[in-house]
Amino acid sequence: MILNPKHIKIQDFNYDLPDKRIAKFPLPVRDQSKLLLYQHGKVSEDIFTSLPSYINKGELMVFNNTKVIQARIHFRKETGALIEVFCLEPIEPTDYALNFQQTEHAAWLCLIGNLKKWKGELLSREMIVKGRLIKLTAERKEAVGTSHWVDFRWNNKKVTFADILEVFGELPIPPYLNRDTQESDKVTYQTVYSKIKGSVAAPTAGLHFTQRVLDALKEKGVDMEELTLHVGAGTFKPVKSEEIEGHEMHTEWISVSKSTIESLIHHGGKAIAVGTTSVRTLESLYHMGVTLILHPDASDEQLKVKQWQPYELPASAKDISSVDALQALLDYMNRHELDTLHSSTQIIIDPGYQYQVVKAMVTNFHQPQSTLLLLVSAFVQGDWHTIYDYALSHNFRFLSYGDSSFIIP
C-alpha cells in the first residue's frame, strides 16, 4: 500500500496514446462497441451487448442519470470578435432545477473564451424561442478564480433559462475531439437514460447502454438504481503538478434518493458502478456516512466530501463498514425528512485508496496522466498497464466516444 497518496508522481501514469486511437465519433450502434473484460487480473474481450452475461442475478448496478446541457453560448461583438460564454454551474439560484425554471434572469459561473476582447460591455444576441423573437444579454460580473459570474437576461416571462440554453446554447463536446459540435452529438453524447439536466460533459461509460441492454439486465434479475452527479468541466482539467498533492480536484454536485441508499444497504453496501462519476458518488456516500458516525450532529456543509478526506481518517474510522456508513446516512435523511440527499464531492481516488462500496465498474479508457486513470489504478491495485496495454494492442477505441471495459478486481 502507498503510504502517502499525495506524493504519487503523475508521470508514472503516462502512456503513449496515438491520435488515431481517439474515437472522434461514436459507432452507429451504441452497444456494438468493444468491451474489455478484466476479471481478477485476467483480460479478455467481447462486445458490449454481452455485458449482462457477466453480471449475476440480484447484483446491483448504479447509473448516473445526469443530462448534458447546451452550455456554450456564443456572442459576436459589433467589432466582429466572437466571445464564448461556457456555463459551468448556477449561482442565482444555485439549485439547478430552480435555475432552469427562471424567467427573465439567471446567473451562472462561466468560463469565458476570448476574455481579453470582452471589456465589460453588455453582450447581446437575438433568436426565435417558442415562436417569439428573444433578445438575450450577458453581463460579466466579478471573477471567481479562473471563471466569471455572468448575469443573463431576456425579455419574456414565458421563456425559461432551460428554453434559452436549448436555443442559444451549443452542446459542449470534449476538447480532445478537436472538432466542432455536430447536430448528431445532441443524441449520441447523451445516455439513453439521461434525465436530470446539469452536466457539461457526459458520463461516457453510460453511452454504450441501449434499451436492449437495459432490458436484458432487467430480464436477468439485475437490480438497477440511479443517482445524479453533474459532471463539471474540471473533469478535463489536466494534472500540471509533478505530484498529485499539487492538483486541486473540482467540486461536483450530487443528488441521491433515499430509495437508492436503501437499495445499497439491502445489497450489503456493495454495487457495480457505471462510470467513474457513479464510482466517485458511491464512495463519497460512504465517507459522508463515516462523518455522521464520527460527528452525529454534522452540518450539511460538513457532509460535503473534501479532496483528501478519505486518506485522513482517524484510526477509529478504519473498520466502519459500508452498510454502517450508509445506514448512518439513511438515519440522517430520516431525521431531516429528506427524500433526496443534495451535496457535493471533491473526492480524489488515488492508488492507496480503499474502495468501500464499488465492487466492479464499467468505464471507458481515460487520458494519460489523468485523475480518472489514477481511480482505475487504485481499483486494480496498480495493474492498469495490463488493461491499457491490451486495449492499445487490440485496436480498442479510446476516450469519450471510444470502447469500454468491465473491471472486477
For each predicted feature, which ranges?
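Surface-exposed, charge/polar-rich loops and edge strands
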Residues: 1-409
